Amino acid sequence: MHTMAEIILTTLNARYSHASLGLRYLYNNLGALQTRATLKEFTISMRGADIVEQLLDKQPKIIGFGVYIWNITETMHIVQLLKSVAPSVKIVLGGPEISYEHADQSITALADYVITGPGEHSLRQLCEQLLNGQRPLDKVIPGISAPLKQLTLPYSAYTDEDLRNRFIYVEASRGCPFKCEFCLSSLDKTAYPFEQDRFLEAMDTLWQRGLRHFKFVDRTFNLKIASTVRILDFFLQRLDDETFLHFELIPDHL
């Protein structure tokens, strides 16, 4: 017996060992719709027809894709296949690769909706409308930059299998104040920290579940020295031979 899901949140990772943090934010912020949704992750090496078959097997009404630089070509192929065999399924795109130059992207024309920027609140609102039979007129929907304290953290959506077998990504802050020309994050206005007690409580839960390798996706981990020291102290108090932290630093704050 197959489990059905009206909403599927999916992406094509570069390889199985990468677990999508973005999908888990979206899933954990669906509110009452979460029971009607599921996560499905694939890799860019999989056959498009196999991915489409697995997606449609759950008989979804909405499929949301996370689009990144490493998967946009493969994702466009998947969306083309979906629209040819299941045109009634609503396709929603989000992610950094289509948030800024969506008008010039071929994949945008194939989709029903595109959410630019932060998607947690905007996706939930869009799904509520679509499942209630409403059809928003605007194809491109700006993401809502709500205060981070309003977000449900994503970490409970990591399964025990994820913790055992995959890279687990975490973030203590969002955004970046720097304006490096080569980086999409230069379009951010500034960096916003998550409330630290709440963040460290979530890290402790992951630690208690057995996680020892933490990969921080913060654009600049040591932007605020006091916050950085507190996070490092948290891990130093729990340090064992398996502990591994990965983060990006700016040298002038060392």
What are the residue ranges of the model-derived segments?
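Short, Lys/Arg-enriched N-terminal segments with co-localized hydrophobic residues
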Residues: 1-3
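Nucleotide-activated donor-dependent transferases that construct or modify glycoconjugates
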Residues: 5-15
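Structural motif
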Residues: 12, 67-68, 117, 249-251
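Tryptophan-centric aromatic hotspots in well-structured domains and transmembrane helices
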Residues: 16, 70, 100, 124, ...
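Short N-terminal binding/cap micro-motifs at the start of the first secondary-structure element
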Residues: 16-22
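Radical SAM [4Fe-4S] cluster-binding motif and immediate context
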Residues: 152-254
